[in-house]
Amino acid sequence: MLLNILAIILVFVISSQSEAVIPGCDYFDTVDISHIPKLNDSYAYEELIIPAHLTGLYTFRQLADGSQEPVKSHLRACICKLKPCIRFCCPRNKMMPNSRCSDGLTENLKRINPYLKITLEDGTIGKYYLLTDMIVLRYEFRYCEKVVSVQEDQYKLYENGSFMIKPDVNWTLSKQWYCLHPRLEDPNSIWILEHVYIPKSMPAVPQVGTISMVGCILTIAVYLYIKKLRNLLGKCFICYVFCKFVQYLIWAGGDLNLWNNICSLAGYTNYFFALASHFWLSVMSHQIWKNLRLINRDERSYHFLIYNIYGWGTPAIMTAITYLVDWAWEDRPDKLNWIPGVGLYRCWINTYDWSAMIYLYGPMLILSLFNVVTFILTVNHIMKIKSSVKSSTQQQRKCIQNNDFLLYLRLSVMMGVTGISEVITYFVKRHKFWRQVLRVPNFFHLGSGIVVFVLFILKRSTFQMIMERISGPRRQQPAS
């Protein structure tokens, strides 16, 4: 009896595993049908009846390079076995659940001549009407190496989904490495976007970002709690840490797919606070250098107002410009290298193409160079002052050296010296060796919330101010 039960369980497990992936079907020929109810052992998808043997449960998402990412178990159907499939691009901010897109492609195709020629396996060429003879699959925009406009006689589309551009040069793309975009102004041509492989992000990024977010919250709370810390520089520091907190919050929400319905809004918000954080770093660099040089440190209220206009106003203007550029060239694939692309590839600005240098890394480079120069001048000024003070004992010299290291480390963080590593990463990101080398400063930047909490909160003077704030002002003892 026990053996029979074990045999039944074994058969069930084997059969379940065999149905997990559809036999003889490429992953990129499948669509998610988990939202479609089963009817008479089949599924209805866009007026097609899909038999059960062409469906299967998938627990992964396959990437273009063949690697897999684990996802929630869902039902997929090998739709391209029933009709030829064609793959059109969809902006990330227009993607809907179950691989749908809200960009109005169907209406646009009706206004042009939506016919495509397909070379079949036997070598014959058939002419297919996109809206009835084919299944239109929607793929998210991915980073593109090339955007090419081809006429009807300049390409061959094969039945297996491969796309040959300009047959005389034999440039062929597999179905997972491209998507199409219609040219409404020229119905006899079409845009083809060749995808590129983007390396996966560093490990433990979500975890480090979440811990950094907590560090930012605690740092802001302490600075708001202790009045002595809320001087002009302290207020600027709070603004900077708040910018980092919002960035970490948006990143964490993106990992949890919370911004799917507001992808563009999340992207522009993240862009604004990313720029603002660098502008506030330059404000603090200027203020530290100014405090060091001036004997009379007069902190008038309008100074902070001016800093606010600069620290928040300039990023707001730049964010408005990026929005207008995206809006003006939204349906122009030939302008992909010129637009910020917020919400196009992901809920963030396009950081792969050289356009990122215009909208993000260019301003960051200018601000980072200013911060580095100011930091060098500040350290040089401090060293000159300290060199005039001679320590009497070796123990005192060692103590001063340790304090100097922490001082310079805190200054480097508050003055944004490490921010230049982001710009360097942009320039060398296509080189595997340098990407690995720059992981250390990138992790330092990613964990800046942890760093500021450790360096500026977990120190003796801050603890003393917290204890004084808790216990209240000390009362003077009366003379006896």
From Swiss-Prot:
Topology within the bilayer: Multi-pass membrane protein
Signal peptide annotation: 1-20
Parts of the chain on the Extracellular side: 21-202, 255-263, 327-356, 429-437
Residues carrying covalently attached carbohydrate according to the record: 40, 160, 170
Disulfide bonds: 25-78, 80-85, 89-179, 90-101
GO cellular component terms listed in the entry, alphabetical order: membrane; plasma membrane
Any matching Pfam family: 7tm_2
Cytoplasmic compartment residues: 226-231, 284-303, 380-405, 458-480
Subcellular location: Cell membrane
This protein's UniProt keywords: Cell membrane, Disulfide bond, G-protein coupled receptor, Glycoprotein, Membrane, Receptor, Signal, Transducer, Transmembrane, Transmembrane helix
InterPro entries: GCR1-cAMP_receptor (IPR022343), GPCR_2-like_7TM (IPR017981), GPCR_2_secretin-like (IPR000832), Methusela_ecto_dom_1 (IPR044860), Methusela_ecto_dom_2 (IPR023311), Methuselah_N_dom (IPR010596), Methuselah_N_sf (IPR036272), Mth_GPCR (IPR051384)
Listed Gene3D superfamilies: 2.30.160.11, Methuselah ectodomain, domain 2, Rhodopsin 7-helix transmembrane proteins
Gene Ontology biological process terms, A to Z: cell surface receptor signaling pathway; determination of adult lifespan; G protein-coupled receptor signaling pathway; response to starvation
Sequence intervals crossing the membrane: 203-225, 232-254, 264-283, 304-326, 357-379, 406-428, 438-457
Entry annotated with the keyword Hydrolase: no
A GO term, aspect molecular function: G protein-coupled peptide receptor activity
Family indicated by similarity: Belongs to the G-protein coupled receptor 2 family. Mth subfamily.
Protein name: Probable G-protein coupled receptor Mth-like 6
